[in-house]
């Protein structure tokens, strides 16, 4: 697929790890990697405008196929001129396949070889999503990077179930490739599954690599397994993927997981974490997480993070942001969300510099110490 609309350019490998500095070229522009991608589930990153996302350095954002199919509908978005025009975002967009949401949100789902029947979580109506339909929806949305329809088995499901699941996912990937009507301007990624089983991850990767996708996603992680288990899966999975194509770790956004994913050769990450925890008043800072709603910040007239130069930290204090959140003012959610997104986008900028300087392991050690991962701060 050398004529693919998605191209990966390797700039530099880090001397001491599997990390790589590169860039991904898409029909709507080029972005540097490794990159964290903010999630815009409903064609908006919660509380943030496209201008703010550009200001903080988001080179690409993610939108959700399942949610946009249900509301407002992919055909309406196509009539609007596609997702880029609909949401006024002129940079790259990645869409997931809808598979994960079907398994995690939908009730009464029934998986067959043809696809998945499930109940619409908005109105209870019966819906059917197949590999072909997932591709058709994404073709209507017009994203730069699309995902194959896959089943995301739970990490601790039995071996026999996971084996059948990955074999079906490979067949679905092949069906999706055939159904893809816009290969000239949308790049379709295959998704490697296999839970924690090394041989099944290898089988899944080999199946998908043989289909020559323009890029590869690693799915089925950040679903309840330990950090060590995730790293172990990455250790044996990323080497199976082509060096000349992008590697995307789905649903991962905790700072330590981002750094450890990069060390193992991953280029792209996404997660709702920064905006989700921001709405509860939890902020990521260079010295660990800070719950700005707490009473101790009532008269704290300093920034959220003394080492951050984002819009929030440059202009507002902990006391003011705490007041906004306590008063249920939307502006408080905007400020905490902006800061958390900026924190992760900026973290990846620092990671890219550390790769350039060949000191990523030292950067990791320093970051982990400051952030407090040695103080039972596992989840953020």
UniProtKB/Swiss-Prot annotation:
> What pathway, per the record?
tRNA modification; tRNA-queuosine biosynthesis
UniProt key word Cell division: no
Question: From which residue to which does the signal peptide run?
Answer: none
From what superkingdom does this record's organism come?
Bacteria
Q: Where is this region: RNA binding?
A: 251-257, 275-279
Which residues are listed for Zn(2+) binding in this entry?
308, 310, 313, 339
* Positions of substrate binding: 96-100, 150, 193, 220
Cofactor comment: Binds 1 zinc ion per subunit.
Molecular functions per Gene Ontology: metal ion binding; tRNA-guanosine(34) queuine transglycosylase activity
* Gene Ontology biological-process entries: queuosine biosynthetic process; tRNA wobble guanine modification; tRNA-guanine transglycosylation
Catalytic activity entry: 7-aminomethyl-7-carbaguanine + guanosine(34) in tRNA = 7-aminomethyl-7-carbaguanosine(34) in tRNA + guanine
Query: Which co-factors does it depend on?
Result: Zn(2+)
Q: Which Gene3D superfamilies match?
A: Queuine tRNA-ribosyltransferase-like
Q: What is its EC number?
A: 2.4.2.29
The active site lies at 96, 270
Alphabetized UniProt keyword annotations: Glycosyltransferase, Metal-binding, Queuosine biosynthesis, Transferase, tRNA processing, Zinc
CC annotations in GO: cytosol
Q: Subunit structure of this entry?
A: Homodimer. Within each dimer, one monomer is responsible for RNA recognition and catalysis, while the other monomer binds to the replacement base PreQ1.
| Alphabetical list of HAMAP family matching this protein | Q_tRNA_Tgt (MF_00168)
- Which protein family is named in the record? Belongs to the queuine tRNA-ribosyltransferase family.
Task of the protein: Catalyzes the base-exchange of a guanine (G) residue with the queuine precursor 7-aminomethyl-7-deazaguanine (PreQ1) at position 34 (anticodon wobble position) in tRNAs with GU(N) anticodons (tRNA-Asp, -Asn, -His and -Tyr). Catalysis occurs through a double-displacement mechanism. The nucleophile active site attacks the C1' of nucleotide 34 to detach the guanine base from the RNA, forming a covalent enzyme-RNA intermediate. The proton acceptor active site deprotonates the incoming PreQ1, allowing a nucleophilic attack on the C1' of the ribose to form the product.
Q: What is this protein called in UniProt?
A: Queuine tRNA-ribosyltransferase
**Which source organism does the UniProt entry give?**
Streptococcus gordonii (strain Challis / ATCC 35105 / BCRC 15272 / CH1 / DL1 / V288)
Instruction: Give the lineage.
Output: Bacteria, Bacillati, Bacillota, Bacilli, Lactobacillales
């Amino acid at each position: 697929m050398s004529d693919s609309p998605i191209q990966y350019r390797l700039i530099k490998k880090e001397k001491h790890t599997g990390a790589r500095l590169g860039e991904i070229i898409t029909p709507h522009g080029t972005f540097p990697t490794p990159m964290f991608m903010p999630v815009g589930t409903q064609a908006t990153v919660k509380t943030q405008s496209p201008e703010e996302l550009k200001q903080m350095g988001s080179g690409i954002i993610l939108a959700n196929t399942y949610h946009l199919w249900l509301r407002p509908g992919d055909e309406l978005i196509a009539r609007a001129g596609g997702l880029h025009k609909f949401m006024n975002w002129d940079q790259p967009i990645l869409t997931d396949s809808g598979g994960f949401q079907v398994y995690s949100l939908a009730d009464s789902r029934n998986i067959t070889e043809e696809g998945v029947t499930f109940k619409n979580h908005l109105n209870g109506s019966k819906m059917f999503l197949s590999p072909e339909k997932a591709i058709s929806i994404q073709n209507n949305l017009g994203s730069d990077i699309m995902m194959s329809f896959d089943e995301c088995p739970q990490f601790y499901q039995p071996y026999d179930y996971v084996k059948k699941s990955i074999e079906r996912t490979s067949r679905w990937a092949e069906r999706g490739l055939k159904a893809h009507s816009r290969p000239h301007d949308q790049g379709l990624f295959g998704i490697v599954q296999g839970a924690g089983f090394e041989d099944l991850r290898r089988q899944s990767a080999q199946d998908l690599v043989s289909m020559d996708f323009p890029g590869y996603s690693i799915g089925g992680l950040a679903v309840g397994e330990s950090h060590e288990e995730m790293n172990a899966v990455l250790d044996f999975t990323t080497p199976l993927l082509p060096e000349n194509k992008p590697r995307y770790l789905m649903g991962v956004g905790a700072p330590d997981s981002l750094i450890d994913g990069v060390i193992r050769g991953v280029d792209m990450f996404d997660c709702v974490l920064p905006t989700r925890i921001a709405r509860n008043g939890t902020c990521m800072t260079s010295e660990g997480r800070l719950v700005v709603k707490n009473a101790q910040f009532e008269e704290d007239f300093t920034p959220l993070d003394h080492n951050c130069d984002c819009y929030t930290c440059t202009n507002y204090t902990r006391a003011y942001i705490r007041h906004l959140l306590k008063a249920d003012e939307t502006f408080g959610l905007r400020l905490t969300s902006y800061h958390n997104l900026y924190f992760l986008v900026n973290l990846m900028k620092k990671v890219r510099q550390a790769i350039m300087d060949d000191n990523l392991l030292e950067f990791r050690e320093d970051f982990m110490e400051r952030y407090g991962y040695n103080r039972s701060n596992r989840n953020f």
